[in-house]
Amino acid sequence: MATASSLFLASPVATAPTARARSTPSASPARPSLRLRRPSTLAAAAVQAEHQPAVAAAPKPPALPFRVGHGFDLHRLEPGLPLIIGGIDIPHDRGCDAHSDGDVLLHCVVDAILGALGLPDIGQIFPDSDPRWKGADSSVFMREAVKLMHEAGYELGNLDATLILQKPKISPFKETIRSNLCDLLGADPSVVNLKAKTHEKVDSLGENRSIAAHTVVLLMRK
């Protein structure tokens, strides 16, 4: 666990249910409605983060022109839980069993950015032993990682992410997920790529018992 107390936000992230925007349905074929997670408490959490930097005492990394980071995450899928991917509520009969909202895509993107900066991983900065992050919206973690990236003098060069899950099919939701990911990163869509793969019914991923994601990021000196 990171030792500096300033690694953490000042107060718990609220988890009360909030309204979610629905995507516009296509003409044909009919697709399940999507819900963009925008908690009403997110603005308050962002204000808290502004007043309490996450790694105030951490030295800036060497001024390399480029830095590369890799992120990986995996969560069990359990019946009756929400399935959140890239900040989007995906219709499914199973969801991620996790301390926060279990957003496997955002978690691995955060880890990739932190890794590129040479900082502790998401589990150290936002540990699952801390009740403040119980049910937390993962966009809070994303915004903090992006803030640290800019404070270190870097910007996103490009990002390539791969989701691995057997069900549901992600293709109907992929562009909505990618668009929200671009918004959280403050990045142009041309530098953010998202792919989805099944696991050919092999092991827990292929048996619809888990979901995983890999992400590689390239950061460029401003």
Curated annotation (Swiss-Prot):
The record marks 99, 198 as: Transition state stabilizer. Binds 1 divalent metal cation per subunit. GO terms for biological process: isopentenyl diphosphate biosynthetic process, methylerythritol 4-phosphate pathway; terpenoid biosynthetic process. Substrate binds at residues 73-75, 99-100, 103-111, 121-123, 126-130, 165-171, 196-200. Pathway: Isoprenoid biosynthesis; isopentenyl diphosphate biosynthesis via DXP pathway; isopentenyl diphosphate from 1-deoxy-D-xylulose 5-phosphate: step 4/6. It comes from Oryza sativa subsp. japonica. It is an enzyme of class 4 (lyase). It comes from the Eukaryota. Its EC number is 4.6.1.12. The gene is ISPF. Belongs to the IspF family. Keywords: Chloroplast, Isoprene biosynthesis, Lyase, Metal-binding, Plastid, Transit peptide. It catalyses: 4-CDP-2-C-methyl-D-erythritol 2-phosphate = 2-C-methyl-D-erythritol 2,4-cyclic diphosphate + CMP. GO terms for molecular function: 2-C-methyl-D-erythritol 2,4-cyclodiphosphate synthase activity; metal ion binding. This is 2-C-methyl-D-erythritol 2,4-cyclodiphosphate synthase, chloroplastic. Induction: Induced by jasmonate, copper, UV and chitin oligosaccharide elicitor. Enzyme of the plastid non-mevalonate pathway for isoprenoid biosynthesis that converts 4-diphosphocytidyl-2C-methyl-D-erythritol 2-phosphate into 2C-methyl-D-erythritol 2,4-cyclodiphosphate and CMP. Is essential for chloroplast development. HAMAP family: IspF. Its main location: plastid. Residues 1-43 form a transit peptide. Homotrimer. The keyword Plastid applies. The keyword DNA-binding does not apply. Expressed in roots, leaves, stems, leaf sheaths and young panicles. A divalent metal cation binds at residues 73, 75, 107. GO terms for cellular component: chloroplast. It is found in: Plastid, Chloroplast.
